[in-house]
């Protein structure tokens, strides 16, 4: 009995030394609850990511495992090295960009697409190491950052509506409404409203509940075939290590690589700042602790993710749900990572999720990301026009890269045309010139 108590106290002492629980005003129990809460809000990614990457021709069972592995790796590393209550997983938006645009629309092998993700992650890692990342964040205007986030939201939302069958291709009008009486459409729409209603009532597992309910209804209608719940993890040999580094070093992919890097730069940085701010972890000068370590872990996770066969990795805003119930240290993130490792044994469940069950989650994420348009100064056209062009051109051109390019260029045009040259930072000018060169010398040929 005494030996057991000694073992427990030594274990708690180790956690105290690693995570400084008392200093942050928290306990092991609180951190465990926070980790479980964060996990419930983001576990949907293990069902949605395989669905999306499956469009690119990747083995969905293997992607399920690699999604769990990289989420576990990134979250545990964030907890141990940065001691922040922030979990990581493959980024929604960039996974859709990879599957629907880079592979499906551009006709590239998914291995080459993974290579583009790798080089984008390496670029992000170098920007972090040499502190250029902080300079770019500070010098790219809010309107462009918001336009990029919102444009990806519109792009994801469109993919969700397409996967649910709500919108379909039409040669005369480009798109038109689908068969709304089809049960797949009805279930996809139902799934979205389940998420929206539960989320508005602060139910943390809203997305997970929606996926479970719509999958069960699909099973009752004969769309889903029960294959079990628990099994040994599927093989990952079909995706792990199949990244084409040489094939992706192509001048024609420069814009794609830059897009992966730039979007991940803003996404992770914004999430890390937002979550740590909500946790009250800023110091007396308003600076956030261990941000360099956090950004480093984020970049390394994306590099690792491309090698094992999954899309760009980012910090998840869903981490704020764990913070809201008391998560203050990296122990929260470690708990999330451990739970993702346990989920690997539930691979049969992931294989049963139909496309329309995941569609509701895509539409919901689109709503969340598009809401950032409210931050644009709409009464200032030099800010509103670039934000609008960036956002709408992503879904309309079916390319996140083109949306970013036209947004940066239009920002320079508006500022130069109105004589507000002081608003143009060197960063914006350099990026805009690079995109102009891409359009003239690469896209034109």
Residue ranges and their predicted role:
Residues 106-216, 220, 334-445:
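Membrane-embedded alpha-helical modules
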Residues 2, 71-92:
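Juxtamembrane transmembrane-helix boundary signature
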Residues 53, 81, 198, 305, ...:
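Helix-capping/transition residues at the boundaries of transmembrane alpha-helices
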């Amino acid at each position: 009995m005494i030996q057991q108590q000694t073992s427990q106290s030594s274990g708690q002492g180790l956690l105290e030394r690693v995570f400084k629980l008392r200093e942050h005003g928290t306990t092991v129990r609180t951190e465990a609850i926070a980790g479980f809460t964060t996990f419930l809000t983001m576990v949907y990614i293990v069902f949605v990511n395989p669905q999306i990457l499956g469009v690119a021709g990747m083995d969905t069972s293997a992607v399920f495992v690699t999604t769990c592995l990289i989420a576990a790796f990134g979250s545990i590393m964030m907890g141990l090295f940065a001691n922040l209550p922030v979990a990581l997983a493959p980024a929604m938006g960039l996974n859709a960009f990879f599957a629907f645009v880079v592979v499906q629309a551009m006709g590239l092998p998914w291995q080459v697409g993974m290579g583009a993700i790798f080089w984008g992650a390496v670029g992000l890692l170098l920007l972090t190491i040499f502190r250029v990342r902080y300079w770019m964040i500070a010098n790219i205007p809010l309107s462009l950052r918001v336009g990029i986030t919102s444009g990806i939201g519109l792009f994801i939302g469109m993919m969700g509506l397409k996967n649910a069958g709500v919108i379909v291709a039409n040669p005369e009008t480009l798109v038109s409404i689908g068969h709304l009486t089809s049960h797949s459409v009805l279930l996809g729409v139902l799934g979205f409203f389940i998420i929206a209603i539960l989320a508005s009532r602060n139910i943390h597992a809203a997305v997970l509940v929606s996926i479970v309910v719509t999958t069960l209804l699909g099973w009752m209608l004969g769309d889903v075939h029960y294959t079990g719940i628990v099994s040994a993890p599927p093989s990952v040999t079909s995706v792990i290590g199949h990244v084409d580094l040489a094939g992706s070093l192509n001048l024609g992919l420069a814009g794609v690589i830059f897009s992966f890097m730039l979007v991940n730069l803003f996404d992770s940085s914004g999430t890390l700042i937002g979550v740590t701010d909500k946790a009250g972890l800023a110091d007396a000068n308003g600076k956030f602790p261990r941000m360099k370590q956090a950004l480093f872990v984020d970049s390394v996770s994306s590099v690792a993710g491309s090698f094992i066969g999954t899309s760009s990795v980012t910090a998840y805003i869903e981490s704020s749900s764990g913070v809201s119930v008391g998560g203050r240290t990296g122990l929260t993130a470690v708990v999330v990572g451990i739970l993702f490792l346990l989920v690997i044994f539930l691979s049969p469940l992931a294989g049963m999720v139909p496309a329309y069950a995941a569609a509701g989650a895509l539409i919901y994420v689109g709503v969340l990301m598009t809401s950032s348009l409210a931050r644009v100064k709409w009464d200032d056209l030099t800010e509103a026009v670039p934000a609008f062009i960036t956002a709408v051109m992503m879904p309309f051109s079916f390319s996140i890269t083109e949306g970013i390019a036209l947004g940066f260029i239009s920002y320079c045009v508006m500022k130069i045309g109105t004589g507000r040259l002081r608003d143009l930072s060197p960063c914006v000018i350099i990026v805009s010139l690079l995109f102009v060169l891409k359009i003239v010398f690469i896209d034109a040929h």
